[in-house]
Amino acid sequence: MPRVEVGLVIHSRMHARAPVDVWRSVRSLPDFWRLLQVRVASQFGDGLFQAGLAGALLFNPDRAADPMAIAGAFAVLFLPYSLLGPFAGALMDRWDRRWVLVGANTGRLALIAGVGTILAVGAGDVPLLVGALVANGLARFVASGLSAALPHVVPREQVVTMNSVAIASGAVSAFLGANFMLLPRWLLGSGDEGASAIVFLVAIPVSIALLWSLRFGPRVLGPDDTERAIHGSAVYAVVTGLLHGARTVVQLPTVAAGLSGLAAHRMVVGINSLLILLLVRHVTARAVGGLGTALLFFAATGLGAFLANVLTPTAIRRWGRYATANGALAAAATIQVAAAGLLVPVMVVCGFLLGVAGQVVKLCADSAMQMDVDDALRGHVFAVQDALFWVSYILSITVAAALIPEHGHAPVFVLFGSAIYLAGLVVHTIVGRRGQPVIGR
């Protein structure tokens, strides 16, 4: 018995020291530490920008609120993540990623000023959405560059852990940015003037991200000039980005399996997002209250994703990427059924649990791309992931918006989401089985 007690004490101390050990590992990698700081500043700005626009577009009585209008707003806000992904990947695999970060953040500052001005003068939805479209496109370049650069600043054996640290830090920053939006909205109102002030505030974290991007040396973030790199003109590299990325995905079953599971999760996220937005608009008379309830749901989902960032590295080491992702997809299919009653408190809890499961699937896919793909093509593959990530999301929202009633009471769509998870599990199981064992799997 004493031997067991001593073992338990040692085991507990090891777990207690784990965060300290991770922190020391982060600080021992100076370039990763700098990259992490850029991510934190950039994603705080992203969260603030997206929440400010959501308040202006979706919780403003002077603007559209029906399901198709909500779907259209989401499509415009996130279209850059799907359309520009292949081009971002091609440029990142050809240009110094430091200058991609610098250039994209500089462009973001200009667009932030433009969008803030559009809101300040009370212009219509079209110029506002066009400005948001371009601003989000530039934000996509930054996010893709940060992900593709990570293996350059982290030893291979630490990629999974440090990727989780990076994603967790970014998620927390985006969450804080989105919730910080509530303060100026409360002080200045929920109209266009308040939204304009929020957008102008985004310039602060983006400026910090820009300045911190300048601290890297030439080619520190990649890409490598390997023999597999795509040569020729820059135009050729941009145009062929998606083709090369897709071909690489097809050739690597571990990557293809991960992306299939991720696509299934994103389709369900789209359905659930539309349902919760319609439900809170229907049951809450005040737009501010509706926005707060919606933010609570998305915050719970983000908190679940944060927890997954902590748990996933251990799960992958114990069971491998393949089994871990399969388990997460199976759990998600079960959790989704519990939300069929469309009770908002229950949906918030399910959102938290689905945030855990979905982020586990994404991290498994990320580790496959970061460890199984040559650096010269990694940016292209991440671009394919970005495109799939957002196309599946936008398509599911659009299809659901055409069928879901305005009050949002459509439990059959919740059950359909569970079926999508099961389909993703089947595809992941079949495709992933073809993959050859690799280090870290």
Swiss-Prot record:
Gene3D superfamilies in the cross-refs: MFS general substrate transporter like domains (1.20.1250.20)
This protein's record includes keyword rRNA processing: no
Pfam families (alphabetical): MFS_1
Keyword Metal-binding part of the UniProt annotation: no
Membrane topology: Multi-pass membrane protein
Domain of life from the UniProt record: Bacteria
Keywords: Cell membrane, Membrane, Transmembrane, Transmembrane helix, Transport
Subcellular location: Cell membrane
Chain segments annotated as transmembrane: 68-88, 110-130, 131-151, 164-184, 194-214, 229-246, 260-280, 287-307, 337-357, 384-404, 412-432
InterPro entries found in the cross-reference section: MFS, MFS_trans_sf
A single cellular component GO annotation: plasma membrane
A molecular function GO annotation: transmembrane transporter activity
Family note: Belongs to the major facilitator superfamily.
PANTHER family: INTEGRAL MEMBRANE EFFLUX PROTEIN-RELATED (PTHR23513), MEMBRANE PROTEIN (PTHR23513:SF17)
UniProt protein name: Uncharacterized MFS-type transporter MT0042
